[in-house]
From Swiss-Prot:
GO terms for molecular function: structural constituent of ribosome. SUPFAM superfamilies: L35p-like. GO terms for biological process: translation. It comes from the Bacteria. This is Large ribosomal subunit protein bL35. Residues 38-64 are annotated as: Disordered. Pfam families: Ribosomal_L35p. Keywords: Ribonucleoprotein, Ribosomal protein. InterPro entries: Ribosomal_bL35, Ribosomal_bL35-like, Ribosomal_bL35_CS, Ribosomal_bL35_sf. Residues 38-53 have a biased composition (Basic residues). Belongs to the bacterial ribosomal protein bL35 family. One of its GO terms (cellular component) is cytosolic large ribosomal subunit. Coiled coil: none annotated.
Amino acid sequence: MPKMKTNRGASKRFKVKKNLIKRGSAFKSHILTKKSPKRKANLNAPKHVHHTNAHSVMSLLCRA
């Protein structure tokens, strides 16, 4: 049986730390002038993948 291949796009977007999968936040790359500093700071805060999607992400990362 051949080796499982890691999804390269997923490997760049997600990092596995202990039991949680870290992810980036959307809506923070451009058109930032109309967004308040508080909103931009909240977008910079670390986020985690929801537990209902965790199995799908782990299978893309070949860790299921």
